[in-house]
Design a protein with these regions (language model features):
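Short Gly/Pro-enriched loop/turn and capping motifs at secondary-structure junctions
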Residues: 315-319, 350-352, 487, 499-501
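Lectin-like carbohydrate-binding module/patch detector with strong preference for beta-trefoil
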Residues: 390-535
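Aromatic-rich peripheral "rim/lid" segments of glycoside hydrolase catalytic domains that contact
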Residues: 321-411, 429-430, 516-535
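Glycoside hydrolase catalytic-domain groove-lining segments
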Residues: 214, 218, 222-319, 337, ...
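N-terminal signal peptide
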Residues: 13-29
Length: 535
């Protein structure tokens, strides 16, 4: 670039820094403590995020033509998310002409006259702002709702992501110059230095394609991490894996080498379609077992190595008609509750300005509906909200470690109304303290245990539990069905009926039946150190 371009770039940088730092002066600083993300007091902060796209062709945060920016931020907060994984393209901060382009002109260049009118109506103060100022406005609006932001470098050239041949996949691809990428990371980290709710930087989304290799991953990801930390040492530095952010198996015997500590997080993506149609066509107990074993082998093992795992993308078709997605989600939620990892759902976006040549495309994975006015599927939102709750971690040792009995198909836990009433489901935050003894008894308050009753009967607590009818063990390939023998010797599994009562029934789907769905009988014992909340 010539000297004039360099001057414009420097002026742009200084102007944006000054405007950004007019917000709250003291930034929230997060760091890592073994596998946990913690605040300055050393208490766990669980990231319960939702992705918000700003990386497509228009380079305008999606949804601004549908609702006021403050309303979208309010929806995110009201749905229980404490964080947004905000997707951005490298060129937003490395191409001066793009960064200074106005929202109006960007939308106009794509022929999006209806979107222009929508932004004029819902966000008139943004329509003639630069693309970067619009991005800044989203961060600010989220901060006003106490929602944290992780800046996610999604692509280099603005576009929908992803394919092996889109030129955005790996270092050295046509749009993925490592030096330009590091320049972009550095600029973005500097631009948001001191902004109170910006807590982390995801260095790159879904590394992929024929050029991907381990040596270049180490070379450039370590350089990128060092650049971000140098520019803004308060940020968490979040590294993605290979194979569409699915594979960290190369870290089993080799460590990332950085000059700083306490900031490194690894991010993973996990969708049903990573395994084709296996969830729909296979035995769900077997598929869940195989998929979770594979995830442990290639990525989730990092938790045991003492690093936080941020599952920065997962999601399902919110219409509820995709059998593959529905079955996967129950297995995912069971794993997410058991491991209590940090996560980011794809996506808050209800519809796009312009995606892959289509104007106004609906996003069926979107938490919000097409006009961004409300949740697309409120029951699914409630179900996923169950894993927003942290079960344990630094600063959360409120009581002795115990178990909660989590039912992933509903996102609820087994609770008691009284010692004399049948067990039912309720919010996990209200669950009692369960203990699973070496003898496999599920006990509560010391003297009371869960007793197996005859098929179809309501379960309840008892003080007269024999070894045969109070020994509960995980069964099936998934290990997600809890089985015991009744006093008459019949094997039964816990199940939830249509009224959310806990009953016992004949164990389902133990054989190779592809059409069988065992989700009503799936339970998992989750470690917790939290006191029950009384409402």
């Amino acid at each position: 670039m010539g000297s004039c371009s360099l001057f414009v770039s420097a002026l742009f940088l200084v102007t944006i820094i000054v405007s950004l730092q007019t917000g709250p002066a003291r930034a929230l600083t997060l760091s890592t403590k073994s596998r946990w993300i913690v605040n300055e007091s050393g208490h766990r902060v669980k990231l319960a995020c939702v992705n918000w796209a700003s990386h497509l062709d228009a380079v305008v945060p999606e949804g601004l033509s549908k609702q006021p920016i403050e309303a979208i931020a309010g929806q995110i907060s009201s749905l229980g998310y404490n964080c947004v994984h905000l997707n951005w393209p490298t060129y937003l901060v490395t191409d001066d002409s793009l960064a200074s382009l106005t929202v109006r002109d960007s939308l106009k260049s794509l022929g999006l006259t209806e979107a222009i009118a929508g932004v004029e109506t819902n966000n008139p103060s943004i329509i003639d702002s630069s693309l970067f100022e619009a991005f800044q406005a989203v961060v600010s609006a989220l901060g006003d709702k106490n929602v944290m932001v992780i800046l996610d470098n999604h692509v280099s050239k603005p576009s929908w992501c992803c394919s092996d041949s889109d030129g955005n996949g790996f270092f050295g691809d046509i749009y993925f110059d490592p030096n330009v990428w590091i320049k972009g990371l550095t600029r973005m980290a500097i631009l948001f230095k001191g902004v109170s709710n910006v807590v982390g930087m995801s260095l790159r989304n879904e590394l992929r394609g024929p050029k991907q290799n381990v040596e270049d991953w180490f070379r450039y990801m370590q350089r990128g991490a060092e650049a971000v930390h140098w520019a803004n040492p308060n940020l968490l530095v979040i590294l993605s894996g290979l194979g569409y952010d699915h594979d960290f198996s190369f870290l089993q015997n080799r460590q990332v080498q950085l000059t700083f500590s306490g900031k490194l997080v690894f991010e993973v993506h996990w969708y049903a379609f990573f395994d084709g149609k296996a969830w729909e066509s296979g035995n769900v107990n077997q598929v869940c077992k195989i998929v979770v074993q594979n995830m442990n082998r290639i990525s989730l093992f990092l938790l045991e190595q003492g690093f936080p795992i941020f599952v920065s993308e997962f999601g399902v078709d919110q219409r509820g008609i995709n059998v593959n997605d529905n079955r996967y989600l129950n297995c995912f939620l069971a794993t997410a509750a058991q491991l209590d990892f940090d996560w980011g759902q794809w996506t808050v976006v209800g519809s796009y300005y312009y995606r892959e040549g289509v104007i106004g495309m609906s996003e069926y994975y979107g938490v919000l509906n097409d006009d961004w006015s409300e949740a697309r599927n409120s029951s699914l939102a409630q179900k996923i909200s169950s894993i927003q709750y942290p079960f344990q971690g630094p600063g959360l040792s409120e009581v002795r470690k115990h178990k909660v009995i989590f039912h992933p198909a509903t996102g609820l836990c087994v609770v008691k109304k009284s010692l004399l009433e049948p067990l039912t489901l309720g919010p996990c935050s209200t669950s009692d303290y369960w203990y699973h003894s070496p003898e496999k008894k599920l006990t509560i308050k010391g003297a009371f245990c869960l007793q197996a009753v005859e098929v179809g009967k309501l379960t309840q607590l008892s003080i007269k539990c024999t070894d045969s009818d109070s020994k509960w063990e995980p069964t099936s390939d998934s290990r997600l069905q809890l089985s015991a023998k009744t006093s008459s010797g019949d094997s039964v599994c816990l199940e939830v009926d249509s009224s959310n009562n806990v009953v016992t029934n004949t164990c389902k789907c133990l054989s190779i039946k592809h059409s069988c769905d065992p989700s009503s009988q799936w339970f998992i014992l989750v470690d917790s150190t939290r006191k029950p909340r009384l409402f």
